[in-house]
UniProtKB/Swiss-Prot annotation:
Task performed by this protein: May act as a transcriptional transactivator.
TM ranges: none
Protein name per the record: ELL-associated factor 2
Chain residue ranges for the region called Disordered: 114-154, 169-264
Subcellular location: Nucleus speckle
Family statement drawn from the similarity comment of this UniProt entry: Belongs to the EAF family.
Swiss-Prot/TrEMBL keywords: Activator, Nucleus, Transcription, Transcription regulation
Primary location: nucleus
Gene Ontology MF terms in the entry: transcription elongation factor activity
Name of the coding gene: EAF2
Family matches, as InterPro entries: EAF_fam, Tscrpt_elong_fac_Eaf_N
Length: 264
């Protein structure tokens, strides 16, 4: 026996006490729980939760070790009452032995769905808060952009200003081109008028200004078209008369010169 743990139940006489469950109005009850499978991820240092619903349905929620997925393990089943079963409880520190009646036997199976226990509800609340805190920036990031919600960028403002300036410059250039075309047309018309005036002046016959004996000619508007040959004829006659006078003067000069020579 050296090096081995002492036996839990030594062969000696003990005092057996009856527990509170043997009273007429028991203040506590004892149950047995039978699992079909108990995972190693269950944290035995933490407390679990047991719920009894309608129809003797039982839900047991046990927390898993921190970092496990999922965070809890859920069992569901039913309970059946015991008739004459008892449980012996031994306190090895004090050596006390106590006998208690069993109230019911609970048989449960592990399920994948999450239970509705208080522990699970608290865990769900914490997870929901974490999801909400992480979902808020994601919603803002992934929300579709709207033209009315977000202000335009500085590049868009500059582009609009450049387009407005370009349209103004186009309008000014079009107005300048129209004014240039009008001025060029007016200058061309004035040049045409001046050229036509010069042609009219060239077409008009030149009248001798050194003839005082000629009568002034009537205006062109008063002269009929048939009078144009008569004007030319009178002009020719005036030239002949002037030539005759010049001949007479030359002959007079010759006679005067010859007379002066004879006197000498």
């Amino acid at each position: 026996m050296n090096g081995m743990a002492p036996p839990l139940f030594e062969p000696k006489e003990r005092v057996l006490q009856l527990g509170e469950t043997f009273e007429k109005q028991p203040r506590c009850a004892f149950h047995t729980v039978r699992y079909d499978f108990k995972p190693a991820s269950i944290d035995t240092a933490c407390e679990g939760d047991l719920e009894v619903g309608k129809g003797e349905q039982v839900t047991i929620t046990l927390p898993n070790i921190e970092g496990s997925t999922p965070p809890v393990t859920v069992f569901k089943g039913s309970k059946k009452p015991y008739l004459k079963e008892c449980i012996l409880i031994i306190n090895h520190d004090t050596g006390e032995c106590r006998l208690e009646k069993l109230s019911s036997n609970i048989t449960v199976k592990k399920i994948r769905a999450e239970g509705s226990s208080k522990v699970q509800s608290r865990i769900e609340q914490q997870q929901q808060q974490i999801r909400n805190s992480s979902k808020t920036p994601n919603n803002i990031k992934n929300s579709p952009p709207k033209d009315k919600m977000f202000p335009s960028s500085p590049m868009d403002d500059i582009e609009r200003e450049l387009k407005a300036e370009a349209s103004i410059m186009d309008q000014l250039s079009s107005s300048d081109s129209s004014s240039d075309s009008k001025s060029s047309s007016s200058s061309s018309s004035s040049s045409e008028n001046s050229s036509s005036d010069s042609e009219d002046e060239e077409a008009r016959p030149s009248l001798p200004m050194s003839m005082p004996y000629l009568q002034p000619q009537p205006t062109l508007s008063a002269i009929p078209h048939q009078a144009v040959p008569d004007k030319d004829a009178s002009h020719n006659r005036s030239q002949e008369n002037s030539g005759h006078m010049m001949n007479t003067l030359r002959s007079d000069l010759q006679l005067s010169e010859s007379g002066s020579d004879s006197d000498d």
